[in-house]
């Protein structure tokens, strides 16, 4: 077991990225356009270009006069991110992008194509302060929070890439990249509102197709429920007992398993949405039959039918001595959880060979 890192809830104070059109709510966009001396309909045009046509470069917004393009480009569409590197695997069906921000901060997103859907896994922070010892992101520490626009640019880029390369459409968004989304709460919630708002106010993606993941910040889970966004909540539990979880998921020293599950139940009750429980299966660490039994009992008692367990075969990370559980152990774990009346499946792992799978993102390069 590596030496534990400290938990970091508050990101280091760094200069904010320049204000971008995507940072602004509808009323703020209207005010920003008015401040430029432009008529209100220009704001709607800009929103349609960004969220509808997926254009972030004003020089390509051909329904605007050249002078207006220059004006809004300088004031509302600064260059935020550079795609510093893109790599593929899974026969081109998985693509990881290394993003470099204007302050040289780096983070990653992953686009995954499936026969029935296209999913982008996006980051909410550069790095992560939750210090989970089996996760490369957590072991790298927290650099800073991402702005709302930096989060949304990952979505816009993936949507445009799918459309332009193959005429496809982005169908699912998961906040499972770098960072703890609920530790960057306000910007993540603002991003979700833009993602789910209908065009031209947002990207028009169904809330049911958006997943927000957390290691278990119980008060923030309850707060998210009160937002009534109706996105899917995913809780990275990884073990049902406090003794092991205190080490595997250090935030458990602040909010214990039962408190996290109670918050998840509150979320399920308010939204009517089934909660996803993420469980990275680690050989001889958290894969024992009794832990499968305890997991099934606790989830059935707390969440009833409003829960599903996603088992994740542990993905390798640099310097780690841990590895995934053998397939027979994995199958027995699934059987035991299901025997307690809880839905349980094994996640299809993508991107392992390019360090794009769950727990592997480290923004190196």
From Swiss-Prot:
Q: Which EC numbers does the record give? A: 2.1.1.192
- The active site annotation covers 108 (proton acceptor), 358 (s-methylcysteine intermediate)
Record GO cellular component, one term: cytoplasm
* Domain Radical SAM core: residue ranges: 114-352
Which CDD domains does the record match to this protein? Radical_SAM
Keyword tags: 4Fe-4S, Cytoplasm, Disulfide bond, Iron, Iron-sulfur, Metal-binding, Methyltransferase, rRNA processing, S-adenosyl-L-methionine, Transferase, tRNA processing
**Cofactor detail note:** Binds 1 [4Fe-4S] cluster. The cluster is coordinated with 3 cysteines and an exchangeable S-adenosyl-L-methionine.
Q: Which GO terms describe its biological process?
A: rRNA base methylation; tRNA methylation
GO MF annotations, alphabetized: 4 iron, 4 sulfur cluster binding; metal ion binding; rRNA (adenine(2503)-C2-)-methyltransferase activity; rRNA binding; tRNA (adenine(37)-C2)-methyltransferase activity; tRNA binding
Catalysed reaction, written as an equation:
adenosine(2503) in 23S rRNA + 2 reduced [2Fe-2S]-[ferredoxin] + 2 S-adenosyl-L-methionine = 2-methyladenosine(2503) in 23S rRNA + 5'-deoxyadenosine + L-methionine + 2 oxidized [2Fe-2S]-[ferredoxin] + S-adenosyl-L-homocysteine; adenosine(37) in tRNA + 2 reduced [2Fe-2S]-[ferredoxin] + 2 S-adenosyl-L-methionine = 2-methyladenosine(37) in tRNA + 5'-deoxyadenosine + L-methionine + 2 oxidized [2Fe-2S]-[ferredoxin] + S-adenosyl-L-homocysteine
Where, by residue number, does S-adenosyl-L-methionine bind?
179-180, 213, 236-238, 315
What the entry lists under InterPro entries is as follows: Aldolase_TIM, Elp3/MiaA/NifB-like_rSAM, Methyltransferase_A, RNA_MTrfase_RlmN, rRNA_lsu_MTrfase_RlmN/Cfr, rSAM
Give the signal sequence positions: none
Q: Which cofactor does it need?
A: [4Fe-4S] cluster
Disulfide bond positions: 121-358
Against Pfam families, the record matches this protein to: Radical_SAM (PF04055)
Binding, [4Fe-4S] cluster: 128, 132, 135
Enumerate the subcellular locations listed in this protein's record, separating them with semicolons.
Cytoplasm
Q: Does the keyword Nucleus apply?
A: no
The family this protein is said to belong to? Belongs to the radical SAM superfamily. RlmN family.
Question: What more is known?
Answer: Reaction proceeds by a ping-pong mechanism involving intermediate methylation of a conserved cysteine residue.
- Job of this protein: Specifically methylates position 2 of adenine 2503 in 23S rRNA and position 2 of adenine 37 in tRNAs.
Supply the name of the protein: Probable dual-specificity RNA methyltransferase RlmN
Q: Which organism is it from?
A: Mycolicibacterium gilvum (strain PYR-GCK) (Mycobacterium gilvum (strain PYR-GCK))
């Amino acid at each position: 077991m590596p030496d534990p890192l400290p938990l970091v809830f508050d990101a280091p104070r760094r200069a904010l990225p320049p204000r971008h059109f995507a940072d602004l709510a509808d009323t703020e966009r209207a005010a920003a356009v008015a401040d430029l001396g432009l008529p209100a309909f220009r704001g709607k045009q800009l929103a349609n270009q960004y969220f509808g046509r997926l254009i972030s470069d004003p020089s390509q917004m051909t329904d605007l006069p050249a002078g207006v393009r220059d004006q809004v480009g300088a004031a509302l569409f600064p260059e935020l991110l550079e795609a510093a590197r893109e790599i593929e695997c899974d026969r081109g069906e998985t693509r990881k992008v290394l993003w470099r921000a204007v302050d040289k901060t780096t983070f990653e997103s992953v686009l995954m194509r499936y026969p029935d859907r296209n999913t982008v896994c996006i980051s909410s922070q550069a790095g992560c302060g939750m210090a989970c010892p089996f996760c490369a992101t957590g072991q790298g520490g927290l650099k800073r929070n991402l702005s709302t626009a930096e989060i949304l640019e990952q979505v816009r880029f993936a949507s445009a890439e799918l459309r332009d390369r193959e005429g496809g459409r982005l169908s699912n968004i998961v906040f499972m990249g770098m960072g703890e989304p609920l530790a960057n709460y306000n910007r993540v919630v603002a991003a979700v509102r833009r993602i789910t708002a209908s065009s031209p106010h947002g990207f028009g993606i169904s809330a049911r197709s958006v997943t927000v993941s957390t290691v278990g910040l119980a008060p923030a889970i309850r707060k998210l429920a009160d937002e009534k966004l109706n996105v899917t909540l995913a809780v990275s539990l990884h073990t049902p007992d406090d003794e092991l979880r205190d080490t595997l998921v250090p935030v458990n020293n602040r909010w214990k398993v039962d408190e996290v599950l109670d918050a998840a139940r509150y979320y399920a009750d308010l939204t009517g949405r089934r909660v996803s429980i993420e469980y990275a299966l680690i050989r001889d660490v958290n894969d024992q039959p009794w832990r499968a039994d305890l997991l099934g009992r606790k989830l059935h008692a707390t969440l009833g039918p409003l829960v599903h367990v996603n088992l994740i075969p542990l993905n390798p990370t640099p310097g780690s001595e841990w590895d995934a559980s053998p397939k027979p152990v994995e199958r027995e774990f699934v059987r035991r959880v299901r025997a307690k009346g809880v839905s349980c499946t094994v996640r299809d792992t993508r991107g392992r060979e390019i360090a794009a799978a769950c727990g592997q993102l480290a923004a190196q390069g």
